[in-house]
Swiss-Prot record:
It comes from Bacillus subtilis (strain 168). Keywords: Membrane, Transmembrane, Transmembrane helix. The chain crosses the membrane at residues 12-34. To B.subtilis YfjD. This is Uncharacterized protein YfjE. It is found in: Membrane. One of its GO terms (cellular component) is membrane. It is a single-pass membrane protein. Its main location: membrane.
């Protein structure tokens, strides 16, 4: 009864500390990714095509005419940005709209959706911003891939 917790070696405390840190890390990443497995993760965004098109999110929408820059990247001001890429839309009024993807959408699939349904209806500045993200060789390669093996 007088004996408390005993360790076999000096490294046991390191193992215990490492295990606790790993559990905390696992819980944090689980709670960040959990929405992807709920009804919230079923539809990430919806596109209404055409000149008056919109990108619909859960509770808001962004008109194509308001888009200044559109890209898939890491949100730099959040812990979630370390683990997951988001779709980031910079609007002409300076506001930023972030669409969480939980890494469900791959970059080529997102590029194809933008090229087919969004890019033709964006303003000239937004089109130039989209095209300037890639070298000419990269863009030709993925456009050829979309023509040969469409996923959408």
């Amino acid at each position: 009864m007088s004996e408390a917790l005993t360790f076999e070696s000096k490294y046991a405390l390191l193992y215990l500390g490492g295990g606790l840190l790993a559990m905390i890390y696992g819980l944090i990443t689980f709670f960040m990714a959990f929405p992807a497995f709920t009804s919230r993760g079923n539809v990430i965004f919806t596109i209404k095509t055409g000149p008056s098109g919109e990108i619909f999110l859960r509770k808001r929408s962004v008109l194509f005419s308001e888009v200044k820059r559109l890209y898939m990247g890491r949100h730099q001001y959040s812990l979630k940005g370390i683990f997951f890429e988001d779709i980031i839309i910079e609007k002409t009024d300076g506001k930023i709209v972030r669409i969480p993807t939980w890494n469900i959408i791959t970059n080529p699939l997102f590029f194809e959706a933008v090229e087919r349904y969004i890019l033709p209806h964006l303003n000239e500045e937004a089109q130039n911003n989209w095209i300037s993200q890639f070298t000419e060789v990269q863009r030709k390669a993925y456009l050829k891939e979309f023509e040969n093996h469409p996923k959408l």
